[in-house]
Design a protein with these regions (language model features):
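Transmembrane alpha-helix boundary signature
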Residues: 1-10, 47
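Extracytosolic (periplasmic/ER-lumenal) interhelical loops and adjacent juxtamembrane/interface segments
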Residues: 7-24
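Long, contiguous internal "core" modules enriched in hydrophobic/ aromatic residues
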Residues: 27-197
């Protein structure tokens, strides 16, 4: 079929770079790692949701409450570690960076992690403002919303720093194997979109 139009590494024959990356970039590893990653995200998310539902459905005394706090902390910690490991390393490499498999960047996974984090904080902030305006979240005040804004601003700066650092290093080195990523984005049909990101 035409699978190789997205992932050129599916047909690495005759390409020494793609053949060298075939231990990581191959259909079997891609499928297993994708199923494992998403599967664990779902399982850990369902477990945390079920614990939360248990807490909501019955009154607790102090000792039971402490047990649930510990339980939720353990499961949330496991999820955060798994999510960070996958979103800050393997997932961006495998799903996104491998679209252009000749190009690589050690900063790319951190860049995608920071952009995911900024998007998450922005979405949380919008939900908090919406729910606050609807009369929910009575304990949330302007300081909380301001803190969310500061947090979002800080990670936006971090995201921008990573993007600029990656772009500047690739631009300055002017190596063909590195500029291959930016050339079609800065000179092609996506120029405006690229510079407004």
């Amino acid at each position: 079929g035409h699978k190789h139009h997205i992932y050129h590494w599916l047909t690495p024959e005759g390409d020494k770079i793609l053949e060298g990356k075939s231990g990581f970039l191959n259909p079997k590893f891609y499928c297993i790692w994708t199923v494992l990653t998403i599967g664990l995200w779902i399982l850990l998310g369902k477990k945390m949701r079920s614990i939360s539902a248990e807490i909501d459905n019955k009154p607790l005394n102090v000792e039971e409450g402490k047990k649930y706090v510990y339980k939720t902390t353990v499961w949330a910690s496991l999820f955060i570690v798994w999510f960070a490991l996958t979103v800050a390393s393997t997932t961006p490499w495998l799903w996104l960076m491998s679209i252009d498999a000749h190009w690589y960047s050690t900063m790319y996974s951190w860049y995608t992690f920071a952009s995911t984090f900024v998007a998450g904080i922005a979405l949380i902030t919008l939900f908090v403002i919406y729910l606050k305006n609807k009369g929910y979240l009575e304990l949330v005040n302007q300081e909380h919303i301001h803190d969310l804004g500061k947090f979002m601003f800080a990670f936006s700066i971090f995201w921008t720093y990573l993007w600029f650092s990656q772009f500047m290093l690739i631009w300055y080195s002017n190596q063909p194997e590195e500029t291959i990523y930016f050339k079609p984005r800065t000179e092609g049909a996506f120029t405006t979109l690229f510079w407004t990101q």
